[in-house]
Amino acid sequence: PSLNNGIWSKRTAILTSATIPLAMPTRVGLNEDDVDAIDVGSPFDYENSALLYCAKHLPLPSEPRRDDAVHDELEKLINAAQGRTLALFTTYRAMHAAADEMTRRLEYKIWRQDDLPKMALVGAVASEESACLFATAGFFQGVDVPGQTLSLVVIDKIPFPRPDDPLLSARRDEIGKTSFNEID
């Protein structure tokens, strides 16, 4: 309600993004009748150009051999993609451990998100076709490296927020039954 009664009651706003959901206006308190929205879809042919692979055979995160098994799987995947990998991790520890291990095992250039500022790093990866980029949450959205430079995206764990996060708990309590659809 505050956005509707505040800045957007005085000025027109045009929002564009690849990730803004059509339900966003009601989430921020705008009257749905006052909003024009359009979803233009994606130009990417997911059905013919993408493959989802879930390594269900890996040990659970709590099991002792998990890291070794993840590194073995990651090595196979990176070799299959001839480098050209964006590997995303939910912790810095996991990112650095995997990057150290892949640097030792593979001949491909392995960049880490803390090697350079974000845009310089994306440029460096884009300029070297077989390079790999290992990163954390800051790279889960908004990274675009056109062409064949990145052909594989690996995510070590789905980045669900901690269930005991106090801010998220308060938001869930406020929203009620539909909080999973609206927040999580």
Question: Can you name each region flagged by the protein language model?
Answer:
Residues P1-D184:
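ASCE RecA-like P-loop NTPase motor cores
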